[in-house]
Amino acid sequence: MPDFSMRQLLEAGVHFGHQTHRWNPKMAPFIYGERNNIHILDLSQTVPLLNSALKVVSDTVARGGRVLFVGTKRQASDIIADAANRSAQYYVNARWLGGMMTNWKTISNSIQRLRKLDELLAGEAQGFTKKERLNLEREREKLDRTLGGIKDMGSVPDLMFIIDTNKEAIAIQEAKRLGIPVVAVIDSNCDPDQIDYPIPGNDDAARAIALYCDLIARAALDGIARQQGAMGIDVGAQVEAPVEPALQAPAEGA
């Protein structure tokens, strides 16, 4: 499991919430105090909750599950994609299309179209005029921006990790409807009740977002390593299993 320190959280500005007048009163239990009209989040609660979130990510991946990273705000977009790619997971970082999870069949059709365009444009796109090729490239670019990060996901994910629960409210609603657990950073203006595995922290500062995403990615990689280790043990057990009865048979007959 990835390690982190209280100092790292402080240096990344994880403890800085929003202006006090913008708060969600449901966040009161996670607020340490206020300074210059800014809420300060209680990092002594963030540490164990972040550890719990990292464990659920690792455990999900270890049993073959998929994690979907969601963060479409400007300062999260690139970080989200990088973390998901680095940990062999999936992401939505441009725009959440309504029904992305609850209407997976329609989304799958769009993904098939994206794959088809990839194939067409990978070759010389023979038989197309310059204008036709340009139109195909534009269509592909548009589809890739919204669906490129989930193109290989295969079906809905087993866990979602979200930056900015207010901005990604539709994604959270869809996860709830499908029973997909949600790990999310909750700032002082968020509703923690919607989140299965909340991480109290700043969801605006790029350094804080980069820290969460790096830790979640490393937890996923930890899960992959555990899954591969378990598979190795299983394979070994399967190889040995047929030998045991054969060795025991003569003893039973004797």
Swiss-Prot record:
Keyword presence, Manganese: no
Molecular function terms from GO: structural constituent of ribosome
Entries under InterPro entries matching the protein: Ribosomal_uS2, Ribosomal_uS2_bac/mit/plastid, Ribosomal_uS2_CS, Ribosomal_uS2_flav_dom_sf
Single Gene Ontology BP annotation: translation
GO cellular component terms listed in the entry, alphabetical order: cytosolic small ribosomal subunit
Keyword Ribosomal protein belongs to the record: yes
Coiled-coil annotated residue ranges, if any: none
Entry keywords, A to Z: Ribonucleoprotein, Ribosomal protein
Family classification: Belongs to the universal ribosomal protein uS2 family.
Protein name per Swiss-Prot or TrEMBL: Small ribosomal subunit protein uS2
Gene giving rise to this polypeptide: rpsB
